[in-house]
Amino acid sequence: MMDRRGFLKNATLVSAACLMDFREALAWGAKDAEVGKAWKGWKKGQFQIHLIYTGVSESMFLIFPDGTTMLLDCGDHNAVGRGKLAVPVLPNPDRHAGEWISRYVRRVNPQKDYVDYMMLTHYHSDHGGNNKFYARKETRDGKDYYLSGFSQAAEYLTFGKAFDRCWPDYNDPLPLTQEAADAFEHMKDFYDYMLAHKKMEIEKFCLGETNQIAMKKDATAYPGFSVRNICANGRIADKEGNIRDLYAERKKSNPVKFSENGMSLGMIFTYGDFKFYTAGDFSDGWELPNGKRFEIEDAIADVVEPAVSYTHLRAHET
């Protein structure tokens, strides 16, 4: 059994094997003849992962080998309100994150402004936006509509389908009325609007599936590519599809809420020998009856094969 420390060590070693040393990587980049030239774009057969950093939002844009695309998270929150903990809004504060992200996507996307999939990993504002910090407030369908995160990006991008952890009932494993209330109200309004006016499909994320997030254009040409859904709503799935509920014992006490981070959606993208793991802010922990500390990251380490790892919380802590 691999513990969390071992898992993170393996992930770090994989990354280090690719990049060696951060300073050395920068040196390599400085010597690269392509530096400063226009980006050549995506080519068929490439699996590209674009980590989009704005300082106030988690966001990732993925281009599958056949050209299928996905925007994973697109948030916004009041960075200045964090005081001494505030970080700069990038590339500058003239625009909100949703617009910056959509501008970037339109530049690198082989389909320009059309994105096949969008996914909110969990209901926190820095991953999806909220109704308290926004670029603009409008009246749509007789009620307030806030352009923040995904809803702002959707003003510039067209999404074909959304994957969500608990749509349409918003009660898996508990009703989204406590910890995630702000982001929940925002995303529900966004989903309702997109269903009514933009013909976007919405589908609940299916834990354990390996074909839900599928290539849409030429899947048979790339049999070595797959996306395996490994965590959702406090549960994890191994390669055989066996599901373990990490919160099963805690549910017996009839709690009113769980940590939203622990509900994060997670996947392993596989392309040949390359594997990439990402799972929003997947993290939580509590003391067991025997006095030992249980961390859900330890549990997911058992179902994650050696892979390049990207999680928002780990990036901030290291």
What are these model-derived regions, one by one?
Residues 1-2:
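Secretory targeting signals
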Residues 6-30:
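N-terminal export signals
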Residues 28-48, 54, 104, 112, ...:
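Flexible, acidic/histidine-containing loops and adjacent segments that form or flank the divalent-metal
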Residues 59:
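N-terminal cofactor/phosphate-binding cores enriched in small/glycine residues
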Residues 66-69, 274:
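Active-site beta-strand-loop-beta-strand hairpin of nuclease catalytic cores
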Residues 74-98, 132-142, 289-293:
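Acidic/histidine-rich helix-loop elements
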Residues 118-128, 314:
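Histidine-centered catalytic micro-motifs
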Residues 311-318:
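Conserved small/polar residues in nucleotide/adenosyl-binding loops
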